[in-house]
């Protein structure tokens, strides 16, 4: 004997059903659902000609559009005698397959008002629609009404509820529902179990989902290809590729042949989690088993190989797929074009672009961004701008990445005005620049000596709510210091120290250099000495900067002490360290110390730089040095 619905669903579900069934009469199914369709639907429906709906139903509803379906409903409700509930169900089912669940619910309520009696199949359709809209309480209310009318829920009814629970963040209710179904004589089928497995993965319960596959078999319900596909997909999304591969062996033992979709899922996951060789091995295995790879298989592998710089392997795969008459798609071309651009093989990238155009594959924003980047990298800025304008003409509108790439290219080529113009154009197009946009332009303006506009762009960045990062501040401080704006740089630096911005050694080095260049070597020294208290370790550039500052004030003993500290505690001195000290001692007239430093530098396999050799040559010309110094340097 079948159980009552209150025994099947969880206690929470039962309370909702009873609450909806209190009082006399039938509950209103969905008080607001009519409004979801809009009354315009009904105007269209009832103004349509009735026609012969039977012929339309016989011919099938697979290609029917929503407006036509609503028009057909209007004709059916006006027909006399009324069509059977079976015929109404066919129409409701067709609309449900269009995923127009709100329309189905509204039509169902219209039928009720016209006293067209619903059957079990009608209730199943409506319950499924409520569940697909995550309106579980309304689905349960309708279930209660259905049972009150004497209809017993079928496995289809309960599977719809199960699906609703799974997608409505009520996975514990879903598990309880399946358990109670089994206890009370219902026999969950493969679809039921697969739905629950999918729900468990949605709620990050992977181990329970995998265990349920074994429970299915124990209960005499064999998992099918769809079930295994759901499990493989769930495992791969979590990065559990080993478990996914083990599942392939289980499928083989159960004589269920994995299809290309399952192999693609695992290959894609292996690629994402950096197991490219394992992905290639699985690719070979699927070919051995007679499973033909498709464009998705090749695209995943090519994209992965490109991301690891294995562009020759990627090119070989492209040749293989073309030879096997598998047409590459947009993803395939994008991966290869981007890889060739980054490898500096721009001629090959352009050839691929030409090839995809010949194949009538329309480039997307990613394609254009890669090519614009390539043109900028090769200082072909006019060509980059042409590509930019061409993509606009093709209704592929530039994004922030496109603008950032072009602005960076123009600023690097000292065409800052062009970069600034692009920045203004972004605003006109309604695009808000990101941190990279503003930082790039600020750097370009500083390099161009336009300190005032660089500061204005920084202020605009803050007022636009775009957060500066450590790179922005580093560029701002460096630009201010190099343009003689130390006081302004100190204001920014003080703000950074008081805020929660974590300062790195590059920021401190920039400020030390700015202080030393402005003649405030004592302030630079104080900041340098405070680094250990701040838990920041100076690098070789910091030491060299401080040594240079000390040397500029002829504090050579202090500078030499820093060299000694570097040799003892690290970081080890480099060519710049020695050359700075050698020049300082030469200018001070201390030939012996200079000679000793040159010998030490040469023992470390460093050589004199252009500035040192130039100074020695001038002193030789003036007769202040003999040729032995030049011989020592070279």
Curated annotation (Swiss-Prot):
Coiled coil: none annotated. Pfam families: PPR, PPR_1, PPR_2. PPR repeats lie at residues 49-83, 84-118, 119-153, 154-188, 189-223, 224-258, 259-293, 294-328, 329-363, 364-398, 399-433, 434-468, 469-503, 504-538, 539-573, 574-608. InterPro entries: Pentatricopeptide_rpt (IPR002885), TPR-like_helical_dom_sf (IPR011990). The keyword Repeat applies. One of its GO terms (molecular function) is adenylate cyclase activity. It comes from the Eukaryota. Disulfide bonds: none annotated. Keywords: Repeat. Belongs to the PPR family. P subfamily. This is Pentatricopeptide repeat-containing protein At1g62590. The lineage of its organism: Eukaryota, Viridiplantae, Streptophyta, Embryophyta, Tracheophyta.
């Amino acid at each position: 004997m079948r159980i009552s619905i209150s025994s099947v669903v969880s206690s929470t579900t039962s309370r909702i059903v009873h609450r909806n069934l209190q009082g006399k009469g039938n509950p209103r199914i969905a008080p607001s659902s009519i409004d979801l369709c809009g009354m315009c639907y009904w105007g269209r429906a009832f103004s349509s000609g009735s026609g012969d709906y039977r012929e339309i139903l016989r011919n099938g509803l697979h290609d029917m559009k929503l407006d036509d379906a609503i028009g057909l409903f209007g004709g059916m409700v006006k027909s006399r005698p009324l069509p059977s509930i079976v015929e109404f169900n066919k129409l409701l089912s067709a609309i449900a397959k269009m995923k127009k669940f709100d329309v189905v619910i509204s039509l169902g309520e219209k039928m009720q008002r016209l006293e067209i009696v619903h059957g079990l199949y009608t209730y199943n359709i409506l319950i499924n629609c409520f569940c697909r809209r995550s309106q579980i309480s309304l689905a349960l209310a309708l279930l209660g009404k259905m049972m009150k009318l004497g209809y017993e829920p079928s496995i289809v009814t309960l599977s719809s509820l199960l699906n609703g629970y799974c997608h409505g963040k009520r996975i514990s209710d879903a598990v309880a529902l399946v358990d109670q179904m089994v206890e009370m004589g219902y026999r969950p089928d493969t679809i039921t179990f697969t739905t629950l497995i999918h729900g468990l993965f949605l709620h990050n319960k992977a181990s329970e989902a995998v265990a349920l596959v074994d429970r299915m078999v124990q209960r005499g319900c064999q998992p099918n290809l769809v079930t295994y596909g759901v499990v493989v997909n769930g495992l791969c999304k979590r990065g559990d590729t080993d478990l996914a591969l083990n599942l392939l062996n289980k499928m083989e033992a159960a004589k269920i042949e994995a299809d290309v979709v399952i192999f693609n899922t695992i290959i894609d996951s292996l690629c994402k989690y950096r197991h490219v060789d394992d992905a290639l091995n699985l690719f070979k295995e699927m070919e051995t088993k007679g499973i033909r790879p498709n464009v998705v298989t090749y695209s995943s592998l090519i994209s992965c190989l490109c991301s690891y710089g294995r562009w020759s392997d990627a090119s070989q795969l492209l040749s293989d797929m073309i030879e096997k008459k598998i047409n590459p798609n947009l993803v395939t071309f994008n991966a290869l074009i981007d890889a060739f651009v980054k490898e500096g093989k721009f001629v090959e990238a352009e050839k691929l672009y030409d090839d995809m155009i010949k194949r009538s594959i329309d480039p997307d924003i990613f394609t254009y961004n890669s090519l614009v980047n390539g043109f900028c990298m090769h200082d072909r800025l006019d060509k980059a701008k042409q590509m930019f304008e061409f993509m606009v003409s093709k209704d592929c509108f530039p994004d922030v990445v496109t603008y950032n790439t072009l602005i960076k290219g123009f600023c690097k080529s000292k065409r800052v005005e062009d970069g600034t113009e692009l920045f203004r154009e972004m605003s006109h197009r309604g695009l808000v620049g990101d941190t990279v946009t503003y930082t790039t332009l600020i750097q370009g303006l500083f390099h161009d000596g336009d300190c005032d506009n660089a500061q204005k762009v920084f202020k605009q960045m803050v007022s636009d709510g775009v957060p500066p990062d450590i790179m922005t501040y580093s560029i701002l401080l460096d630009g201010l210091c190099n343009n003689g704006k130390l006081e302004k740089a100190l204001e920014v630096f003080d703000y950074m120290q008081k805020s929660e911005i974590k300062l790195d050694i590059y920021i401190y080095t920039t400020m030390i250099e700015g202080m030393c260049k402005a003649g405030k070597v004592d302030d630079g020294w104080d900041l340098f000495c405070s680094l250990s208290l701040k838990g920041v370790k100076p690098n070789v550039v910091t030491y060299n900067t401080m040594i240079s500052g000390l040397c500029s004030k002829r504090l050579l003993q202090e500078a030499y002490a820093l060299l000694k500290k570097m040799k003892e505690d690290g970081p080890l001195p480099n060519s710049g360290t020695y050359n700075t000290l050698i020049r300082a001692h030469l200018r001070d007239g201390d030939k012996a110390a200079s000679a000793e430093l040159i010998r030490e530098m040469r023992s470390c396999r460093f050589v004199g730089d252009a500035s040192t050799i130039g100074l020695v040559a001038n002193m030789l010309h003036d007769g202040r040095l003999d040729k032995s110094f030049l011989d020592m340097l070279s």
